[in-house]
Amino acid sequence: VIDNAEKLNCAYQPEFSMESVPPDDKETFDMLAEGHTVGVFQFESAGMTRLLVQSQAEGIEDLIAIISLYRPGPMQFIPMYLENHKEAARVKYQHPLLKPILDVTFGCIIYQEQVMQIFRDLAGYSLGRADIVRRAMSKKKHDVLEKERQIFIHGQQREDGTWEVEGCLNRGVDQATAETLFKEIQDFASYAFNKAHAAAYALVALSLIHISEPTRRRGIS
């Protein structure tokens, strides 16, 4: 089907190619913002179409976030995402180290990778250990989480006195912020999505829009 669609486009536009799908093509995102999503993978449901119109997505990072949020669990965070997306300059971060991690999602924890980055950058976890804690959060293992909450805040030393995990306090994050942040991470981690998966879905969707956009403008179906 895609091969036939590409050939049809090439008949009218010889330079057309599926090999170079622009990730920020204005015409493509204008179509999404206007709700033209019929037949587009991931985006053609009424709810998703409405969300795309509301968000006025401008780039592939917006699409990745929307795909990750439009699921039964994280749907509750969509209003906060839309509000922050609209007023990006007003988004506040509990600690400066969070900005480079959450800036792309306007202060919202959406991806599994973000959860792991927070554990690494604020508390000194290795990414491997951070992923173990993330999985414990998603499975609601309360005994593990209480232990890790203490480690996240205060750190953990090896028998020789060296730090296995430095903890937030030893990295300049105050205790109140660390405790609040752990609770927020725990709430979000239950629903956090793998960004790589969402990115793959977004690229497929963009490819379908890219291949259909010239024919739509010509009224070909």
Residue ranges and their predicted role:
Residues V1-A192, A200-A205, R216-R217:
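Mg2+-dependent phosphoryl-transfer active-site scaffold
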Residues H197:
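Pyridoxal 5′-phosphate
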Residues I209-P214, R218-S221:
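Single conserved hydrophobic/aromatic residue that forms the stacking wall/gate
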